Amino acid sequence: MDISRAEQRILHHLAQGGRIEITREGKAIAEIRCFTRDGWVYPGVDLELFRKLKRKRAIKSSAGKPYRITERGLHLVRSELNNR
């Protein structure tokens, strides 16, 4: 399954140790932020992209923790030298 360039960028950050944190207002998602492994905020994540990655089961959250990349997400992301 092919993934878009924006999805590829986010998955690369997550493969290197990043995370996606969400803020909720009630049940609705209010804010989505992607953090790199160094703690910097990556601005390229919006609600639509987040839902696409979730639908493809490339990211997952467990026990209320931030979203991380899954095994399936690692298979979807193309390897680059800095991700190995």
From Swiss-Prot:
Check the record and name the Pfam families matching this protein: YjhX_toxin
From which domain of life does this come? Bacteria
Family of the protein in this entry: Belongs to the UPF0386 family.
Question: Which NCBIfam families does the UniProt record give?
Answer: PRK13687.1
HAMAP family for the chain: UPF0386
Entry protein name: UPF0386 protein R01313
Organism, as annotated: Rhizobium meliloti (strain 1021) (Ensifer meliloti)
Provide the organism lineage as a comma list.
Answer: Bacteria, Pseudomonadati, Pseudomonadota, Alphaproteobacteria, Hyphomicrobiales
